[in-house]
C-alpha cells in the first residue's frame, strides 16, 4: 500500500505518549494513519478512537489499520465535535490532534489547496457548503481584507482584496492558478513565504474555520476536565500555536484572580494539570531533510492530572 502522507514529529509524538499502558487514545485528526499505526504497534494495551472529517483519508486508514480492527473505532467528524460523540471519556489517557493539511490534500489537484491547482476548493470536509470558490467570488472587499489581515497577517491585505474584486468583476475566478496569478509572487518584507502562499493559507483557514474549530475543541476539553490524560497538539500556523499556548498557560494556573488583586480570593486550586513542553517542539534536522513540509510544525503537550475532576 502506497502511503500518500508522511506523519510529522513521529518520534516526538512517541516520546510524549511512551508511558501509556491502558485506557483509550483519541486521534482527533487521523489523516492517513501514520501516528496511530505507530502508537497501536507500541501500545498493545490501548484502545483507539480515530477521527477525521475527510472521507477519503478515513477510508484509506481503515484499510491501513485493518490488522488492529478489534482495538480501533472510526468516526467521521470534525475534531471540534468528536468529544461530544464518543463514549469512554473518563478512560481517555491520550489525545492527539495534528491540525495541518495532509500532503495528499495539498498534492491532489481536485482538492484545490495548491497554488497550481485547476480547482478552487480547499475544503477539508468535502461535504461543507462553503469552498474557496465562494470566499473568493462572493465575499465583500471588506471581508476579504479582514481575512488576509487576520489570518494571513498580510500588511497589504486591502490591496490584495481590491485586486481580487477587480478581476472577478470581469470574470469569476475558477481556479487556484488564476488566483495565484492575480495575487502575484511577491514576498512580504522580512518573510520568506510569498504573499500568495499567505493569502491561500488565510482563505483555507476561513473555509474550514480552523481557528474557531481549535478554540471550540480546547474549550470543550476545559469544561470536560479530563484526568490522568496527556494532550498533544501539532500546529502549523503561528496563530494556532498562540491559541494552544494560551490555553495551556491558562489551564496550568491555580489562581484565576484578576492580576490587580493583591491577595488570592479564588481558592488557588483551579489548575487542570501541567504543561509538559516548556516550549514548542519542532522537527529535527534529520526530519527536515526527509520531509520539508515538517518545517512549520510545532507541538505542545499538556498533562491533565485533575484527580478530583473538579
Curated annotation (Swiss-Prot):
Pfam families: Methyltransf_5 (PF01795). GO terms for molecular function: rRNA (cytosine-N4-)-methyltransferase activity. Coiled coil: none annotated. One of its GO terms (cellular component) is cytoplasm. The keyword Transferase applies. It is found in: Cytoplasm. Keywords: Cytoplasm, Methyltransferase, rRNA processing, S-adenosyl-L-methionine, Transferase. It comes from the Bacteria. One of its GO terms (biological process) is rRNA base methylation. Belongs to the methyltransferase superfamily. RsmH family. This is Ribosomal RNA small subunit methyltransferase H. The gene is rsmH.
Amino acid at each position: 500500500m502506497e502511503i500518500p502522507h508522511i506523519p510529522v514529529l513521529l518520534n516526538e509524538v512517541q516520546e510524549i505518549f511512551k508511558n501509556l499502558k491502558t485506557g483509550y487514545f483519541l486521534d482527533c485528526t487521523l489523516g492517513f494513519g501514520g501516528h496511530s499505526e505507530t502508537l497501536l504497534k507500541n501500545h498493545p494495551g490501548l484502545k483507539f478512537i480515530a477521527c477525521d472529517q475527510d472521507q477519503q483519508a478515513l477510508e484509506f486508514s481503515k484499510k491501513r489499520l485493518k490488522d488492529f480492527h478489534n482495538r480501533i473505532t472510526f468516526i467521521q467528524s470534525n475534531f471540534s465535535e468528536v468529544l461530544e460523540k464518543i463514549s469512554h471519556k473518563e478512560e481517555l489517557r491520550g489525545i492527539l490532534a495534528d491540525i495541518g493539511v495532509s500532503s495528499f490534500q495539498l498534492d491532489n489537484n481536485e482538492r484545490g489547496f495548491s497554488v497550481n491547482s485547476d480547482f478552487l476548493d480547499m475544503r477539508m470536509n468535502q461535504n461543507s457548503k462553503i469552498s474557496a470558490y465562494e470566499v473568493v467570488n462572493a465575499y465583500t472587499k471588506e471581508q476579504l481584507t479582514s481575512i488576509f489581515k487576520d489570518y494571513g497577517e498580510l500588511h497589504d491585505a486591502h490591496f490584495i482584496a481590491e485586486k481580487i474584486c477587480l478581476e472577478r468583476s470581469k470574470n469569476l475566478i475558477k481556479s487556484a492558478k488564476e488566483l495565484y496569478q492575480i495575487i502575484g509572487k511577491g514576498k512580504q518584507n522580512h518573510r520568506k513565504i510569498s504573499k500568495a502562499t499567505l493569502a491561500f493559507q488565510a482563505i483555507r483557514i476561513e473555509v474550514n474555520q480552523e481557528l474557531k474549530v481549535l478554540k471550540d475543541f480546547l474549550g470543550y476539553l476545559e469544561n470536560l476536565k479530563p484526568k490522568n490524560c496527556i494532550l498533544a497538539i501539532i500546529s502549523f500556523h503561528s496563530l494556532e500555536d498562540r491559541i494552544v499556548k494560551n490555553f495551556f498557560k491558562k489551564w496550568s494556573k491555580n489562581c484565576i484572580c484578576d492580576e490587580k488583586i493583591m491577595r488570592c480570593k479564588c481558592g488557588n486550586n483551579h489548575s487542570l494539570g501541567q504543561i509538559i513542553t516548556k516550549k514548542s517542539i519542532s522537527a529535527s534536522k534529520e526530519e527536515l531533510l526527509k520531509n520539508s513540509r515538517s518545517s512549520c510544525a510545532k507541538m505542545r503537550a499538556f498533562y491533565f492530572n485533575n484527580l478530583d475532576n473538579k
